[in-house]
Amino acid sequence: MALTLRVLCPDQNVFDGQADEVILPSTTGQLGVLPGHVSLLTALDVGVLRMRDGNQWTAIALMGGFAEVDDDEVSVLVNAAEPASGINAEEAQKQLSEAEQAWSKFDGQPNSPDKIKAQQAFQKARARLQATKAN
């Protein structure tokens, strides 16, 4: 028995298929879902969704949203998502370094809109790079 997984963004259907196991980046930590899981609704953080089909793991970088688990169906609604297969690891590493440098300029400063944007850019860049290493 497998899970039906759907990953949806406002502008595209990123994934619609079967998986034996799904690991979600919830706001309270990693959340593993197997067939027969209890129904739930959870907020998702910026991070990496991992799904297993047999012995093959696949990753998708998620940019925050929500997930619903109900009757062996996992519906993931996110602001943006990018399959690891479409991410260039070298470019992702470069973007992470740039985002980290931009965010570090705000060390010790109180929160401001610019500091929060820099932190979000860092989190997104980190998720993209992690997705490339998750396969």
Swiss-Prot record:
Keyword annotations: ATP synthesis, CF(1), Hydrogen ion transport, Ion transport, Membrane, Thylakoid, Transport
Record bears the keyword RNA-binding: no
Cell location: Cellular thylakoid membrane
Region (Disordered) residue spans: 91-122
Highest taxon in the source lineage: Bacteria
GO molecular function, one term: proton-transporting ATP synthase activity, rotational mechanism
Membrane topology of this protein: Peripheral membrane protein
Entry function: Produces ATP from ADP in the presence of a proton gradient across the membrane.
Oligomer status and interactors: F-type ATPases have 2 components, CF(1) - the catalytic core - and CF(0) - the membrane proton channel. CF(1) has five subunits: alpha(3), beta(3), gamma(1), delta(1), epsilon(1). CF(0) has three main subunits: a, b and c.
Membership in a protein family: Belongs to the ATPase epsilon chain family.
Protein name: ATP synthase epsilon chain
